[in-house]
Amino acid sequence: MRLDKFLSQQLGVSRALVARELRAKRVTIDGEVVKSGAIKLTPEQDVRFDGNPLQQMVGPRYFMLNKPQGYVCSTEDPDHPTVLYFLDEPVAYKLHAAGRLDIDTTGLVLMTDDGQWSHRVTSPRHHCEKTYLVTLEHPLSDDTAQQFADGVQLYNEKSLTKPAQLDVIEPQRVRLTISEGRYHQVKRMFAAVGNRVIELHRERIGDITLDDDLAPGEYRPLTTEEIASVGAPHL
């Protein structure tokens, strides 16, 4: 990558401003002041701005985050804090959520700067399953699991939901696995059968399960196996 492009990404400024900073001798490579933005960087080089190291990124990045309540999954929001607050990573604003959660929903969020990978997570064509832990206002009706297996009619939609698996933990606490991503789908499915979701926590996306060791607001890089599992055929 060219130095000027790298600095533009790292500093979040235009290349014109990067050129000004280079002329001001604020950038060094391996301890030497550089003024040309055309230099091609190599991964082992030590790039610094005002003496502060700038980390070179090799390839796309993938993380799992345990999202707490009160944060939105967009990268910018004028009214609410975003999940980027938790990501102590260079150029964090380049990351986006592969499958968002509502502000009051907690649990697994996948963060990446790989657009094709996130498309495989969210595209209906790939049928990526998601599992949620759901707390309900009322005890579950005996026929709800079968209704979800058959598909339910959501308000103001023509087609039934795809078959979903419902496992009862307690009368008002269940685990739901769906393979779609309709708007507010879990909440609307329970509303369609006369119940209401009180708490919603996502545990799994595809073969990626939220790490039990991650406290709310904590994150970790995905493993090579977890990254490769997205979009892989299930035999």
From Swiss-Prot:
Domain S4 RNA-binding: 1-68
GO biological process per UniProt: enzyme-directed rRNA pseudouridine synthesis
UniProt enzyme class: isomerase
Keywords: Isomerase, RNA-binding, rRNA processing
Reactions listed under catalytic activity: uridine(516) in 16S rRNA = pseudouridine(516) in 16S rRNA
One GO cellular component term: cytosol
Pfam families, alphabetized: PseudoU_synth_2, S4
CDD domains listed in its UniProt record: PseudoU_synth_RsuA, S4
Family classification: Belongs to the pseudouridine synthase RsuA family.
Protein's job: Responsible for synthesis of pseudouridine from uracil-516 in 16S ribosomal RNA.
PANTHER family, per database record: PSEUDOURIDINE SYNTHASE, PSEUDOURIDINE SYNTHASE FAMILY PROTEIN-RELATED
Name the record gives this protein: Ribosomal small subunit pseudouridine synthase A
Organism, scientific name: Yersinia pestis
Organism phylogeny: Bacteria, Pseudomonadati, Pseudomonadota, Gammaproteobacteria, Enterobacterales
